[in-house]
Amino acid sequence: MEVILKKDVDNLGFKDDLVAVKNGYGRNYLIPHGFAELATPSARKVLSETLKQRAYKEQKHIDEAKKQAEKLNNLEIKITAKAGAGDKLFGSITNGDLADALAKEGVEIEKKYISIAGGNIKRLGQYDATLRFHREVISNFSFDVVGDA
């Protein structure tokens, strides 16, 4: 029996996958619990149309992410912070601070998509970070942490 999954199912597949299962598993568990629907010809047609639309939207997201990554590569990012003796910061620079600095430069991104190498920053200097615009578009960049003048 072939079914189309409506939700992700462990050890079976992801949403909108067409999978072959045993008749009892499909009829007695997957379909009644709302995890799947029977793969009728009309359901297959709807699935193929849905997948086409999703692929088109996904490509648009990838193109937009690539533009953002290109924009990021051309930027010089500097974050100013108060520092004490030995270039040690009062506090630390986090993903949120870096997201705010990027927003000022025109790159809007949520802080959860930023990964600073080595964790939070506690000293002045140059650091590397990774920005995940999309699961297929990842950009590495450097930024400077400078003291208040």
Curated annotation (Swiss-Prot):
Q: Which GO terms describe its molecular function?
A: rRNA binding; structural constituent of ribosome
Alphabetized InterPro entries for the sequence: Ribosomal_bL9 (IPR000244), Ribosomal_bL9/RNase_H1_N (IPR009027), Ribosomal_bL9_bac/chp (IPR020594), Ribosomal_bL9_C (IPR020069), Ribosomal_bL9_C_sf (IPR036791), Ribosomal_bL9_N (IPR020070), Ribosomal_bL9_N_sf (IPR036935)
Record keyword RNA-binding present = yes
Please give the biological process terms from Gene Ontology that the record holds. translation
Q: Which UniProt keywords apply?
A: Ribonucleoprotein, Ribosomal protein, RNA-binding, rRNA-binding
Q: Where does the signal peptide begin and end?
A: none
This entry carries the following GO cellular component terms, namely:
ribonucleoprotein complex; ribosome
State the family it belongs to.
Answer: Belongs to the bacterial ribosomal protein bL9 family.
Report the protein's function: Binds to the 23S rRNA.
Protein name, please? Answer: Large ribosomal subunit protein bL9
Q: Which gene encodes it?
A: rplI
